[in-house]
């Protein structure tokens, strides 16, 4: 996937991913106390995900990256790929498990005019991925896999009762044991009530701090006078304990990204 255009074939996507990941590595080398890498994958519509395993391994073993971004829909809104629980994804999951790295589930741009990228496609993908995990048995086969679903988990926290009920109707185990040992949400939610709901519904151990500043939604909220995407402020103001806040800001990430934890320990942190 190239930027927002989805241009090029498998060879172009592979070259572009390598170039982007190498650029990330340059930034890390310039600011090693501030950044660590998570890699882009050379996913293309119709190309087996197993072809991305080599770039993941290169980034982790050679560049020192600690995870990857995984798109459940390389087609850009047409959903031509199999569900994330399908065995066609397993070769890549085997590499994730071997390297002990998590993946953030995140689509690229929308190539479907029905779905605005930021306002619809992203949230659709977050929610769809979670439902796929409910329907499948992926974590029985890969009990150590870890996925982060961004944007507060899409629509999931707001409809938590729906998903609990669907799991029951589909004769799936309860969500805490079936999905939530392996799936985490971030805090990229752009208003205080949304963050408050996330903390009320989802266990604190499943929430990682996330920020999209200089990212998806710019501008100052006229109701607060602060930037919409200043997500740290929402976490700071949430009615949670200092210990839980520390989990969100640091400890949960160190647990989900063990290679990050190892780097920080080497720094004496």
Model feature map: region roles:
Residues 5-11, 110-126, 163-182, 227-232:
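Active-site gating loops and adjacent loop-to-helix segments of metal-dependent hydrolytic enzymes
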Residues 1-132:
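Active-site gating/metal-coordination segments in enzymes
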Residues 63-66, 98-102, 118, 142-145, ...:
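Glycine-enriched alpha-helix->loop->beta-strand junction motifs that scaffold or abut catalytic
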Residues 36-39, 68-70, 103-105, 147-149, ...:
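Hydrophobic faces of well-ordered beta-strands that scaffold small-molecule active sites
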Residues 22-30, 54-58, 66, 185, ...:
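Mid-to-C-terminal alpha-helical segments outside catalytic/metal-binding sites
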Residues 134-180:
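Aromatic-lined glycan-binding groove of carbohydrate-active enzymes
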Residues 75, 109-111, 153-157, 191:
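Short, catalytically relevant binding-site loops at active-site mouths
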Residues 32-33, 64, 91, 140-144, ...:
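Proline-centered flexible-loop/turn and helix-kink motifs
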């Amino acid at each position: 996937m190239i930027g927002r255009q989805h241009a090029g074939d498998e060879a172009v996507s592979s070259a572009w991913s390598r170039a982007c990941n190498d650029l990330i590595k340059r930034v890390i080398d310039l600011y090693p106390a501030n950044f660590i890498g998570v890699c882009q994958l050379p996913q293309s519509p119709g190309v087996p995900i197993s072809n991305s395993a080599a770039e993941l391994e290169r980034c982790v073993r050679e560049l020192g990256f600690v995870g990857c971004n995984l798109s459940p829909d390389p087609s850009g809104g047409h959903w031509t790929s199999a569900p994330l629980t399908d065995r066609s994804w397993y070769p890549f999951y085997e590499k994730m498990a071997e390297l002990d790295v998590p993946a953030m589930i995140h689509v690229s741009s929308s190539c479907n005019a029905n779905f605005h990228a930021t306002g619809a496609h992203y949230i659709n993908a977050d929610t769809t991925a979670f439902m796929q995990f409910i329907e499948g048995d992926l974590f029985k086969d890969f009990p150590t896999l870890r996925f982060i679903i961004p944007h507060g988990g899409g629509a999931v926290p707001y409809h938590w009762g729906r998903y609990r009920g669907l799991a029951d109707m589909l004769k799936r185990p309860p969500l805490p044991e079936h999905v939530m040992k392996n799936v985490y949400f971030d805090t990229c939610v752009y208003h205080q009530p949304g963050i408050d709901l996330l903390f009320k519904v989802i266990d604190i151990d499943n929430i990682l701090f996330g920020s999209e500043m200089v990212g998806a939604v710019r501008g100052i909220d006229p109701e607060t006078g602060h930037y919409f995407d200043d997500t740290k402020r929402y976490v700071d103001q949430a009615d949670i304990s200092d210990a839980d806040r520390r989990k969100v800001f640091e400890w949960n990430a160190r647990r989900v990204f063990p290679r990050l934890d190892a780097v920080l320990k080497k720094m004496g942190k």
